[in-house]
Amino acid sequence: MSIQVFCDFDGTITNNDNIMSIMEKFAPPEAEEVKNRILSQELSIQEGVSQLFRLIPTHLHDEIIQFLIETAELRNGFHEFIQFVNENNISFYVISGGMDFFVYPLLQGLIPKEQIYCNETDFSNEYITVNWPHPCDHHCQNHCGLCKSSLIRKLSDTNDFHIVIGDSITDLQAAKQADKVFARDFLITKCAENYIAYTPFETFHDIQNELKHLLEVKS
């Protein structure tokens, strides 16, 4: 049995949700209603996020990237946490509903690209189009967009110990099949509603300390 860590990006690895930051800065007011319909689960994540990005003109590409480079911050302890999982041969994957044009640059030099799973964007038309290269498998009918539970099934064995780290509704389906969940923000609410055991966290130091204990117990 091996330990597999599946970690969200927006609002988890980074302090802020980068998609929401983009919408607040660059989208028209109607983005707020779409966001609320996603959080209430009235819209599927795939449809809601597609609608959000269709509100953003593609000519803002360079401006958006520059904005995120200047404002996005990695959560406290993340660098040390990555060093810890590497030293202990723990498999680590980023499974993100975020977009390639900002996830890859913000993680460059920290996480190999082959360990990052995110959505793809097309800037060839007037407005941004989101492509979905990691859809739901036949076990999931939630129209996740990037289906985290499907990726967990694809990347690991059922005998592995699955750890999910996340912060929002987009992490709920993955949390349902995890052996251990580290949660913050809205994911705490959803875990409580669905009777999913979780450990709250604010920094990656919190998670690293818990993992140290887990390794001691399993050794």
Curated annotation (Swiss-Prot):
The protein's annotated pathway: Amino-acid biosynthesis; L-methionine biosynthesis via salvage pathway; L-methionine from S-methyl-5-thio-alpha-D-ribose 1-phosphate: step 4/6
Enzyme class at the top of the EC tree: hydrolase
Any one of the GO BP annotations: L-methionine salvage from methylthioadenosine
Entry's EC annotation: 3.1.3.87
Keywords: Amino-acid biosynthesis, Hydrolase, Methionine biosynthesis
InterPro entries named in the record: HAD-like_hydrolase_phosphatase, HAD-like_sf, HAD-SF_hydro_IB_MtnX, HAD_hydro_PyrdxlP_Pase-like, HAD_sf
Family: Belongs to the HAD-like hydrolase superfamily. MtnX family.
PANTHER family according to UniProt: PHOSPHORIC MONOESTER HYDROLASE, UPF0655 PROTEIN YCR015C
Protein name from the UniProt record: 2-hydroxy-3-keto-5-methylthiopentenyl-1-phosphate phosphatase
Organism name: Bacillus cereus (strain G9842)
